A protein has these predicted regions:
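Solvent-exposed residues in well-ordered beta-strands and their adjoining turns
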Residues: 10-14, 52-56, 68, 93-95, ...
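A short, structured loop/turn motif at beta-sheet edges
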Residues: 12-15, 40-45, 68-73, 91-100
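Glycine-rich portal/gate segments that line the openings of hydrophobic small-molecule binding cavities
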Residues: 30, 39-84, 135-152
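Hydrophobic ligand-binding cavity/cleft-lining segments
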Residues: 1-45, 152
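Intrinsic-disorder/low-complexity, polar/charged segments enriched in Ser/Thr/Lys/Arg/Asp/Glu/Gln
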Residues: 2-8, 48, 62, 75, ...
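Beta-strand/loop substructures that line and gate deep hydrophobic ligand-binding cavities in soluble
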Residues: 79-134, 151
Length: 152
């Protein structure tokens, strides 16, 4: 079962401020407590991010995110592999009151537990996926409103 998403989130800062925040990969766990482990060098083409995600369901998801396209202030595309595989794309556009983050993904479970869950309870699998997206966007917006802390 493939889960395809196309979500849009209004954020309270302009594209430059958002980009400055997401470039600080060492800070991701500050606003995403469900990101249990995260290893990334930078937001640049060719980088491979290793992630352990704690979903709202009782399991961890381990993935590698390989950045395939990075267009500063506008776009990030990636290939996802591991427990879940597929593609993801973030697009940033300006708005009068901040910016919009569009998150598009097409992902399928590869780990047997997750494949089984998606097969017998597709609504539960979609809930877990959407929870990570929506909660993550909300936590990022909250972090942006508070103003990022720490070194650039």
């Amino acid at each position: 079962m493939e889960i395809t998403s196309d979500r849009r989130y209004a954020l309270p800062v302009d594209a430059q401020a958002l980009w400055s925040t997401i470039e600080r990969t060492h800070s991701y766990q500050d606003w995403w407590p469900w990101l249990r482990a995260f290893d990334a060098e930078a937001l640049r083409v060719g980088d491979r991010w290793r992630c352990v995600i704690r979903s709202p369901l009782p399991y961890l998801v381990r993935v590698t995110v390989a950045l395939s396209e990075v267009d500063r202030l506008h776009l990030v595309s990636a290939q996802v592999s591991g427990d879940i595989e597929g593609t993801a794309r973030l697009t940033i556009s300006e708005r009068p009151d901040g910016c919009e983050l569009r998150v598009e993904s097409s992902l399928a479970p590869k780990r047997p537990l997750l494949r089984g869950l998606a097969r017998v309870a597709p609504g539960v699998a979609r809930f877990g996926h959407e929870w990570v997206l929506d909660t993550g966007a909300g936590q990022l917006a909250e972090y942006l409103r508070a103003g990022p802390k720490g070194p650039p």
